[in-house]
């Protein structure tokens, strides 16, 4: 058996949940390649990651749009947790509002129980008073500034897609048309890029690159709306699971270049 301990039940559960996730991830990674562990330098880099110090403000009013986004985001976060796409404290969701501000999930709040009032409003680079937003807030802000077509961002750690993040095996979405239409040409960036090279990470996204994978870290999916980004997250995990399962049967036959061109033409996909 396994025994874990911490100062409270939440801490102990979080450790156990993470332990189980890592074990399953290693098993799946071994099915497609050789898992790559973090170096001591990378561990120290992650540990030195600073929390963004933002000025605070007190919102004068919460609009009906904002309230609706808060409710929808909680619903999607709970759904992602039930599907094991995120963990109790791992996984960041954000949604841009029509005035350019955005709502983001808080730091260190259990994703299984997060409520609308827990979510954090970021406006003009300032943080809603009395709340602690995700450590990736600046990355979300930069992506929104660089890409007016992006209105929602999700950072997650799903078991199957992460098998590609911890190995040197490339993720290829050309399995079935839906996978390619949703995910197009996913890019892989080095560990730590999302907080040491924020601008470069943000500039990696494009209509043909809606998903970025960070080595030994996470995946980032973007969309025109929260449900659109969530669809991409689900499709990415389903596709990764299919590839890993099929790899045990033989060579995988991907959609060829001519078929890809036809899909791009028929569905008016942009570069």
Model-derived regions, located:
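Glycine-rich flexible loops
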Residues: 1-271
